Amino acid sequence: MILESARLDVLPGQEDAFLAAFEQARPLIAVQPGFVSLRLLRCLDPGSESRFLLQVEWERLEDHTEGFRKSAEYQGWRELLHHFYSPFPLVEHFGSDSLG
């Protein structure tokens, strides 16, 4: 199991529009081979209300990097969401063999 973690800094004042677009984009990722689950969390710290954390579980790293990112659905995902970000998200992948 792989956990993709993305810190999303949304343009201030665009949070509601981003959340609406995210709901439209969610089915695009959910149909991907190897997709397991996702959750979107909003930062609670004062002054950081425009920051979100996206966590996506994949069966394998390649399901995200080779599968989803090279799919037609990813193009739709980009069109719906990427214009909300500044700066562009930091995306990292974590494996089950991590310490803990």
Residue ranges and their predicted role:
Residues 95-100:
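Short, low-order "capping/linker" segments at domain edges
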Residues 11, 30, 43-46, 82:
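General helical structural elements
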Residues 2-9, 39-69:
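Short, well-ordered beta-strand segments in beta-rich or mixed alpha/beta enzyme
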Residues 17-21, 67:
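Short amphipathic alpha-helical coupling segments at ligand-binding clamshell hinges
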Residues 22, 26:
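Short amphipathic alpha-helical/adjacent loop interface patches that line ligand
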